[in-house]
């Protein structure tokens, strides 16, 4: 089995470091691709990012456990829609049910005033980040999510309880038949950064536990 953690927009593969370390310490190996690195030979937009991400996943011969945060979750939904036979299970973290076009527009305006070095730190240019966000505005997740049949865990940070991301998580839980829902305490949108220990524990328990009796009970060994 291949385990892949997919970062969100504004992150890179290092955003998973603490989660990855905790899982490694407990005998689970994970892959953490950098989305901007795998799309570097193409114009940066969502279609090209998905194509290169799908090629990356298809390079593995084994079935896959996919974990995606935000943008990563959108890619996971598209991948399982096209290649359901490749998937063992998926975890969606802070993943939108409907693309918030107004929020994306505001975010792009903010991006235009941010220093270039902030984007360079995650391996992309300001221009590429703006282009990517623009290309995602018309994606249609509601057409795809109800057709997901694999075991699915949907996660949202506790601090998002009053915003659109919590509503999205509950809606995904409603329309995906074999899904369960988990709130991670002391975390906002970037759950992998805000509370990596509890997230790693939750991922471990979901992957290693019995699906029908899934609940967060197993405790991971915490590295120093």
Placement of each model-derived feature along the sequence:
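Flexible "cap/lid" loop of the alpha/beta hydrolase fold
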Residues: 81-82, 90-116
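Conserved alpha/beta-hydrolase "acid-adjacent" motif
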Residues: 161-168
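Catalytic active-site module of serine/aspartate enzymes centered on a nucleophile-bearing elbow/loop
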Residues: 186-224
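Short beta-strand/loop motif that positions the catalytic acidic residue
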Residues: 148, 154-157
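Gly/Ala-rich beta-loop-alpha elbow adjacent to hydrolase catalytic centers
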Residues: 68-76
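Active-site glycine-rich loops that stabilize anionic/oxyanionic intermediates
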Residues: 8-11, 70
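Active-site loop/oxyanion-hole signature of alpha/beta-hydrolase fold enzymes
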Residues: 17-20, 29-65, 201
């Amino acid at each position: 089995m291949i385990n892949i953690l997919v970062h969100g927009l504004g992150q890179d593969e290092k955003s998973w470091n603490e989660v990855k370390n905790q899982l490694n310490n407990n005998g689970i190996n994970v892959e953490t691709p950098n989305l901007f690195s795998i799309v570097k030979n193409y114009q940066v937009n969502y279609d090209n990012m998905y194509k290169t991400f799908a090629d990356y996943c298809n390079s593995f011969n084994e079935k896959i456990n996919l974990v995606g945060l935000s943008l990563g979750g959108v890619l996971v939904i598209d991948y399982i829609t096209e290649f359901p036979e490749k998937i063992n299970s998926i975890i969606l973290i802070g993943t939108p049910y409907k693309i918030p076009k107004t929020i994306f527009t505001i975010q792009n305006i903010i991006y235009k005033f941010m220093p270039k070095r902030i984007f360079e730190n995650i391996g992309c240019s300001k221009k590429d980040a703006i282009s990517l966000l623009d290309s995602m505005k018309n994606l249609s997740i509601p057409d795809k999510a109800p057709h997901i049949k694999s075991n699915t865990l949907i996660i949202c940070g506790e601090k998002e309880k009053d915003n659109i991301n919590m509503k999205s998580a509950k809606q995904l839980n409603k329309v995906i038949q074999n899904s369960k829902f988990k709130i991670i305490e002391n975390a906002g949108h970037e759950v992998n950064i805000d509370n990596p220990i509890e997230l790693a524990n939750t991922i471990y328990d979901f992957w290693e536990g019995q699906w029908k009796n899934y609940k967060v009970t197993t405790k991971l060994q915490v590295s120093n």
